[in-house]
C-alpha cells in the first residue's frame, strides 16, 4: 500500500512539473519566505523554458485529466464554486468530461451476480455485454427482464474505494498545504471543498441512494407534462447495482433532431425553467446534476415537449426558511431593492448579524447595477446568484452547500434554455411562478396548516418549559412552591407561543409587502393573538 502511495505521489509530481502548476502557487504575493525559497530547490526551474502557451486554467484542467477520474470529478465540483474561484479557472474546469474506458464486462457480470445472488441469465432474458456508457464511478449496460421490460443496469466500478481513499488523502494533503501557504488559498477554503467532495463521491458509490432519489423525483412529477423520470425496479437494486426502466429520447443538445421533429423550442426552454422552480419551491427536492448528458426530450409530443431526467446521484433540498429567503431575495433583487436584499441575507443568518447593512447594501448595488443595464432577456439568473454570493463572501457569508448546488443547477438549466431558445427571458418566466408561490404561502389554507402543525407541539412545549424551570429551581424548593412554579412555566410557554405567532404574522405581512399586496387576514389574526398571549396576566 505504501509503495502504491509513493508511486501516486511521483505521478502527481510529474504532472505538476509537466503543466507547470508550481507557477500557480509561486505567483502568490504573500507566500512565507521559507516556501518562496523552495522554488530555488526545484531543479526544473533552472532549465531553459519556453513561454507557457496555455492559460493557467487550461493547464490545471489538463493536469486533472491526466491524474484520472477522481481528480476529474473533483475539478467538476470545483467548477461549480464560482463564488470562490477566479472566472478563467472556473470556465476551464467546466470543460472537464467524466469519460473513462469501460472496465471488463465480465467483472460487471460477476458483480451483478454477487449482488443479486442469481445468475444474469436467471434475471434477464438479454444482457448486452457492451456497455452503453462508462464513467469514473460506474458503467451502464442495456438488458431485458424476463417479464419483457427493457431496462438499464448500472454497475459500480470494482476496486474503487481504495483508489478514492488514496486520492482523497493526497487532495486533503494538498489542500492543507495550500491553506498554510497562502492567504488567497485560505479564502477559498480548500480543505472544506475537499470535504464536500469526499461526501459527494462516497454518496455516488451507493446506488441505493440514487435509486431512492430517482423514486422520489418520479413521484414528484407523476402525471406531469413537464418531466418524466424512469421507473426504478427496487427488487433488483443493491448498493452496487441499479436497475431502471430504459428510456428512448432525443439528447437535449441534439438540435438537428429536435428541429426535424418540429419540437416547440420556446416551450421546451420555458418548461426547463418551470421544472427547476417546481423542484426548488414546490418540492424542495431538486436534481442537482442536470448537465446535458443527463437530460433527454421525449419524442411523443414535440408540440408539447417533455423532459426526461436520468442519473439522480446528486440531489439538493432547501429548508422552508431557505426557500422563503431565496424567493424574497430574487424578487427584491429584480426590484433593485438592494437594502432589502442585504437585510434578508442578515435575517437568514447567511451573513453575520453584526454586518453593517449600509455597507453590504452599497456592495450589492456596486456589483448588481451594471447587470441591469442589459435587457432582461440577456441577464443571467445564475450569474446574478453567483455575483450575489461572491459579494456576500466578502462579508463572511458561511458556505451554504445547498445554495451552491442550487446555483450550479440554475446555471446548467439557464445555459441549456438559452441554447434551445436564445431569446429566453428567464426572469419573465420565473417571476409569475415565484409570486404565485409567495401568495400560496400566505393563503388562509397554508396559514391554518402551519398553525395546526404548531398546535401539535403545544402540549410538549409546556411540559418542556416546566421541566426546564424545575431543573433550574432551588434545591430547597418545597412541595408548596411547585404548583406556582408550574403555573409560571405554563405562562412562559404561552408567551413563547405568542412570540411565535407574532413572528409568523410579521413574516406574512412582510411577504405581502414584497409582493406589493395587502396583508391577508391570517397575518392580522396571528399578530393579534400573539400580542394577547404575550401581554396577558
From Swiss-Prot:
What's the protein name?
A: Probable protein kinase UbiB
In this protein, which residues make up the domain named Protein kinase? 126-494
Q: NCBIfam families given for it?
A: PRK04750.1, UbiB
- Localization in the cell: Cell inner membrane
Q: Name one Pfam family in it.
A: ABC1
InterPro entries the UniProt entry points to? ABC1_dom, Kinase-like_dom_sf, UbiB, UbiB_bact, UbiB_kinase
Q: Which UniProt keywords apply?
A: ATP-binding, Cell inner membrane, Cell membrane, Kinase, Membrane, Nucleotide-binding, Transferase, Transmembrane, Transmembrane helix, Ubiquinone biosynthesis
Which coarse location class applies to the principal site listed for this UniProt protein?
membrane
Report the protein's function.
Answer: Is probably a protein kinase regulator of UbiI activity which is involved in aerobic coenzyme Q (ubiquinone) biosynthesis.
So, what pathway does this thing act in? Cofactor biosynthesis; ubiquinone biosynthesis [regulation]
